[in-house]
Every structure is written in structure tokens, then in C-alpha cells.
Design a protein with these regions (language model features):
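Beta-strand/loop edge motif enriched in small/polar residues
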Residues: 1-218
Length: 218
């Protein structure tokens, strides 16, 4: 992913107020912009605003795993909606987001106003190697209930065919719904992401696991 523009000059600073939500807290000032921390798990629908910047505060789960058939006990479905032009600027490799099975991310950017997941250092001007920097924050993991092939033949294609996704030690993917809908990603830029969980298991910029064809990515 490319580095892109920084936080911008004073003419386009985002100095609004953090939304009132149990999943958002005041963080700090970032390059003159108001920074609001998103805290998980997000257990009801949340829509971000466009007059501030955000960061993922550690692991942010969207929803609680609904299972391969959407009926898992304790599961909670939630939708995170990110409007066009919003920037999420993470501070550490431990900042990442997991959209659990049965939940959605609706990130509808546009060509002129993309949604940007980046590093805080790219906003405040402290990033020294923008052309080669990686691993400054975790990434995006999207999990669905669509069939996967990494299980035994006797359960393949059923809701019991599930496994832990790469980039995690606990997040589960898979199910029996080919048309499963995990949301929308349109004009979303992911910069400076990636994290090694342990050797051979790492987060990438965007990880899809068991995502069905109802999910829209453009």
C-alpha cells in the first residue's frame, strides 16, 4: 500500500468531538486532529462521524462470533459503518480489527474520499520511511460463514466445518452459507499494516476468512 497524503494542513484539520458511544473514548490530539479511540468488542451498531480521526485501541472485535450457522450461544451481531473520507490511524502493532461471523463492516469510501486505515506516525509527520514501512499496526480481519475447505470430508460444506483464521489464535471462520454477507469495502486504503502472531502465522493488510459472495469488495 502506498503512503499517501499526511494529516494535512490547518485548512483541513478535523477538530470535532468524539461521538458519544460506549465503544468510543477520547484518545489524544494527532497532528492537530481530534483522535477518538474505538474500543471493542462492538456489540451494537456503530456509525463513525467524519469530523474527527479514529484509532483502533488494541483488538477491536465487531460483534461476538455467531457460529457457522448463525445460532451460536452468546453470539452478537453488530455492524460498524465507516463513512467516506474517514481516517483510522493506529499507534501499535496490537491495534487491529476483527469482524466476527454474523457481523458486518460497511466501509463505503469513494474515489475522491477514500477510507484510510493507516499509522498514526503517517499523520503526525514522524514516519521516517514511508516507502518501506510495514508492521506499524495489525490489520483488518473479516470472518464469514461461507464454506471453507480446511476440514475433514465428513463435515465439509456444513456449519461444523470451521477453523481458526491465520493472523489469530482464537478467531473462527467458516460455515455453510456461500452467500454470507460480511459487509462492504469500497475505496478503502490500508497502509503500513502487518503483524506476526507467531512464526508462520501473521496478520496481513486485509485477511478474509470464510467470506461469502454477499460481501462486496471494490
Amino acid at each position: 500500500s502506498d503512503g499517501g497524503a499526511g494529516g494535512g494542513g490547518s485548512s483541513n484539520l478535523l477538530t470535532g468531538t468524539c461521538p458519544s458511544s460506549p465503544f468510543i473514548s477520547n484518545d489524544s490530539n494527532l497532528g492537530g486532529n481530534t483522535l477518538c479511540a474505538i474500543v471493542g468488542p462492538i456489540t451494537s451498531d456503530l456509525t463513525l462521524t467524519t469530523d474527527v480521526m479514529y484509532r483502533l485501541s488494541g483488538l477491536v472485535d465487531v460483534g461476538v462470533d455467531m457460529g457457522g450457522d448463525g445460532t451460536k450461544s452468546g453470539g452478537v451481531a453488530a455492524t460498524l459503518t465507516i463513512p467516506a473520507g474517514v481516517t483510522l490511524a493506529q499507534k501499535t502493532p496490537d491495534d487491529y480489527i476483527v469482524v466476527q461471523r454474523g457481523s458486518k463492516i460497511v466501509a463505503n469510501g469513494t474515489r475522491s474520499e477514500p477510507i484510510r486505515f493507516t499509522a498514526a506516525s503517517a499523520i503526525d509527520g514522524s514516519l521516517t520511511n514511508p516507502d518501506s514501512a510495514i508492521g506499524l499496526w495489525g490489520g483488518i480481519v473479516i470472518l464469514g460463514k461461507a464454506p471453507i475447505n480446511k476440514c475433514s470430508n465428513d463435515v465439509r460444506g456444513t456449519a461444523a466445518c470451521e477453523r481458526v483464521v491465520e493472523g489469530s489464535t482464537t478467531a473462527i471462520m467458516g460455515g455453510a452459507s456461500p452467500d454470507d454477507d460480511s459487509g462492504v469495502l469500497n475505496f478503502v486504503r490500508v497502509e503500513y499494516a502487518g503483524k506476526e502472531i507467531f512464526p508462520g502465522n501473521e496478520l496481513n493488510g486485509i485477511t478474509f476468512g470464510g467470506v461469502g459472495y454477499g460481501t462486496k469488495v471494490d
